[in-house]
């Protein structure tokens, strides 16, 4: 299939650049893929669809303040976007500057902290922060929240809270698992009180999630890699859910990628920790999920392909056209979809 098969027209005015005042105030477009039906609602309406005995799987990754500004020894400005922390004072990162820095170069950040360029690893630079202060603390002091490239504004203190889920615990992501941004603690408590089980896994979202596909055919695309951990509690919760006849709902495409990566190692699913470069596109056979809560994704992106694999390409493009016509808000700070997959799509 061609990448252009997953393109759609999006007016720039529909790209949300700020969050709504309340997390649960977002709109919700419900797509019942089995019956090809759409319903316009607001986010709390998920309580009508996620029933007692169902399982909601969350991603508890926490976004780090991964964007840093500074200058080279020549005085030229640099912008650093961390991709992942690799241990101690080291990290992999993208660097934007007028001239590519060489190994051994020293960069100075806002606040005077020095960073040494150790070398290259593929598309990323290997960096070492020269400081006695632990790297996570340095980032909290000098880093900026890594808002996506389509949000054309500087980050604000409010983004430290709102570009983060209320259940974020494990630092390491450089982009938010945005489907989770719509939940607040009262809504989660209502779901639990109604008999919905929750389980958490971790997938540290990388900046590669925003990278465009540069091939004409999707089969020629090389997917970026991300680190994940699916603990025993998740596989046990899925087993319990299946035994009682419940359904498994993923909160976000990151959860889909994590669960289906673990399932690819064999079913019943076992705990899994490591890297994944799974590419989910039409033709993929889902083994775990029955439904997905997700945001609206960029035209021609791997995430549009993922939701198309679950619900069908034509159904997704039709739903997106409806969302555009109804003035839904798109992307990270935008509105949400609930996709109910045909039961045959998941075991």
Locations of the language-model features?
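Surface-exposed, charge/polar-rich loops and edge strands
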Residues: 1-347
């Amino acid at each position: 299939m061609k990448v252009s098969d997953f393109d759609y027209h999006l007016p720039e005015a529909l790209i949300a650049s700020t969050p709504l005042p309340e997390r649960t105030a977002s709109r919700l477009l419900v797509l019942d893929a089995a019956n090809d039906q759409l319903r316009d609602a607001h986010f709390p309406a998920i309580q009508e669809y996620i029933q007692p005995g169902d399982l909601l799987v969350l991603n508890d990754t926490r976004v780090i303040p991964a964007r840093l500004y500074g200058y080279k020894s020549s005085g030229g400005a640099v912008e650093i976007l961390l991709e992942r922390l690799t241990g101690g004072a080291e990290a992999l990162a993208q660097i934007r500057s007028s001239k590519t820095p060489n190994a051994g170069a020293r960069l100075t950040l806002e606040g005077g902290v020095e960073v040494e360029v150790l070398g290259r690893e593929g598309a990323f630079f290997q960096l070492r922060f020269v400081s006695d202060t632990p790297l996570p603390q340095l980032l909290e002091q000098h880093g900026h929240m890594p808002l996506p490239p389509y949000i054309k504004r500087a980050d604000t203190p409010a983004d430290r809270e709102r570009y983060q889920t209320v259940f974020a615990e494990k630092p390491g992501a450089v982009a938010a698992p945005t489907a989770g941004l719509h939940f607040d603690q009262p809504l989660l408590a209502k779901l639990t009180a109604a008999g919905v089980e929750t389980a958490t896994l971790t997938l540290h979202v990388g900046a590669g999630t925003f990278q465009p596909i540069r091939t004409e055919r999707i089969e020629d695309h090389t997917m970026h890699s991300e680190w994940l951990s699916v603990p025993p509690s998740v596989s046990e919760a899925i087993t319990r859910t299946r035994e009682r006849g419940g359904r498994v709902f993923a909160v976000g495409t990151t959860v889909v990628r994590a669960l289906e990566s673990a399932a690819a190692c064999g079913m019943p699913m076992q705990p899994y920790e490591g890297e994944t470069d799974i590419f989910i596109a039409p033709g993929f056979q889902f083994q775990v999920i029955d439904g997905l809560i997700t945001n609206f994704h960029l035209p021609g992106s791997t995430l549009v392909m993922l939701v198309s694999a679950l619900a069908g390409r034509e159904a997704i493009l039709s739903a997106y056209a409806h969302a555009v016509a109804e003035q839904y808000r798109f992307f990270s700070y935008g509105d949400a979809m609930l996709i109910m997959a045909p039961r045959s799509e998941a075991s």
